[in-house]
Regions:
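Extended interfacial segments that mediate partner engagement and assembly in macromolecular machines
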Residues: 58-69, 75-199
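Short, aliphatic-rich beta-strand segments
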Residues: 215, 221-230, 287-291
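Short, solvent-exposed loop/turn elements at beta->coil junctions and helix N-caps
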Residues: 114-121, 203-204, 210-212, 446-449
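Rossmann-like S-adenosyl-L-methionine
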Residues: 2-8, 16-17, 233-465
Length: 465
């Protein structure tokens, strides 16, 4: 279709994927990087039955809920699409998202939602970021102007993928999501690599030495850096030595050789260059070892509050057998173990289960057991006979929710309480509907884990009827 202009579109709500919503002549228009209350001119570039997608052309009048953004890349980077929206308004829309999903997609009664738990830090809250090297840097308007005027533009960049452009990377100057030394480290590594003429990866033809850099931090002050190369060479090892020399505060410096077409490193060997091969984080009196490919909630401070809510909802006693479904690296299982008789954790990823066992051992917790495998296959009658019928189940499935077989097994086991943690209230509402015959929703607590994004976590307490 040929793009066309809509003038004076009033933005009335926040919608899916972090986009905002306007309406004109019965057509719903999705626009990124604007906020409810703005009046804007937009260019429609995609139109389907009942809705259209548009890009911002001009803001005609500003919403009272619009705030100044901290990020110099806002409007290009897709990471923090709600950053221009006042944080209290963000919370209202996230709360409404849970309410709407439960009301419209669920077929069950539920009590009034508890007020959403805000994040204490709305900037610099992430403990992990991954940046991509690319020799196809996204050129912004300023770059294009300089190029037209005959200036040579550096094509290499280190940053985040541009939304919708698989082969383009936005070169990041400053990211307000992770505390220092994240920004300084990323910028210094890029400068060194360019000065030494190290080749940046080209995702189209799969050439270039430098692929990714992962930076992990912890509440204890420890720092892990993992650099991903396509080969080990004198040049790549010189970069590792540069990082070690320039950033002595790094406690775990590692590298990976990845010659695959995709960026995943979970199935690859991680090589230790200096320091330890892990960092540690703490919650209460527990210490968690985090390896290079370990899953760990990226907002540590808010994760502690989320797990505290789950533990409070569960009301675990010393006689309770607890099943922790989709346990990941066993963080929740270990967090609640001291209140329980026994905790059984199940997770699909083998490496995560090994981390879970290590963390139990590290904290001298002896009443946990962990199993790896597909939940719908592992959680069978023989498994329950072997491990005991649970009194309490804590479940934290991926965005797709729980498999119908798992829900059927929950209905068979009939635990007295189910604590359902979800990063997708839509699939959570679907699953709770299937559990409604035997369980009523007693409490609902939304939690904001990711400020400036549309994502919301939700904890629901289900009690046996």
């Amino acid at each position: 279709m040929k793009p066309y202009l809509i003038s004076d579109l009033e933005i009335i709500s926040a919608g899916a994927e972090g986009k905002a919503i306007g309406k004109v002549d019965g057509l719903v228009v999705f626009v990124p990087f604007v906020v409810p209350g703005d009046v804007v001119d937009v260019e429609v570039y995609k139109k389907k039955k009942g809705y259209a997608e548009a890009r911002l052309v001009a803001i005609k009048s500003y919403s009272p809920h619009r705030v100044d953004t901290q990020c110099p890349h806002f409007g290009l980077c897709g990471g923090c699409k709600w950053q221009a929206l006042d944080y209290q308004q963000q919370l209202l829309y996230k709360q409404q998202q849970v309410e709407d999903n439960f009301a419209h997609l669920g077929k069950f009664d539920f009590p009034p939602l508890q007020p959403i738990l805000a994040s204490e830090n709305i900037f610099y809250y992430r403990n992990k970021l991954e940046y991509t090297f690319s020799n196809l840097r996204w050129l912004d308007d300023e770059d294009m102007t300089l190029q037209k005027n005959g200036k040579t533009i550096e094509p290499r960049g280190l940053g985040f993928h541009i939304p919708g452009k698989f082969d383009k990377v936005l070169d990041i100057k400053h990211c307000a999501l992770q505390e220092d030394p994240s920004n300084e480290l990323r910028n210094r590594v890029k400068e060194y690599a360019i000065a030494q003429n190290l080749s940046f990866y080209n995702i189209r033809n799969h050439e270039g030495l430098l692929r990714n850099i992962v930076i992990r931090t912890s509440s204890t002050g420890e720092i892990m850096v993992i650099v991903v190369f396509t080969e080990k060479s004198e040049k790549t090892m010189s970069l590792m030595q540069f990082i070690k020399d320039e950033f002595p505060q790094i406690t775990s410096l590692q590298y990976v050789i990845n010659t695959k077409l995709n960026d995943s490193i979970t199935d690859l060997e991680v090589h230790l260059y200096s320091g330890k091969d892990f960092i540690v984080d703490t919650m209460e009196d527990l210490t968690f070892k985090i390896g290079p490919v370990s899953f760990y909630q990226t907002n540590s401070q808010q994760a502690y509050r989320l797990y505290s809510i789950a533990r409070e909802f569960a009301q675990i006693s010393s006689e309770d057998v607890v099943y922790d479904l989709y346990t990941g690296t066993g963080t929740i299982a270990n967090f609640v173990a001291r209140q329980a008789k026994k905790v059984v954790g199940i997770e699909y990823v083998d490496a995560a289960i090994e981390d879970a066992k290590i963390n139990s051992e590290y904290n001298k917790i002896k009443n946990t057991v962990f199993y790896a495998g597909d939940m719908k296959d592992v959680l069978n009658r023989d498994f329950i006979c072997q491990n005991g019928t649970p009194n309490i189940v804590i479940t934290d499935p991926p965005r797709a929710g729980m498999h119908a077989t798992v829900i059927d097994r929950l209905l068979e086991m009939e635990p007295k309480r189910i604590v359902y943690i979800s990063c997708n209230p839509a699939t959570q509402a679907r699953d709770i509907t299937l559990l409604d015959a035997k369980y009523k929703v007693e409490k609902v607590q939304p939690v904001d884990m990711f400020p400036h994004t549309q994502h919301v976590e939700n904890v629901a307490l289900l009690v046996k009827r």
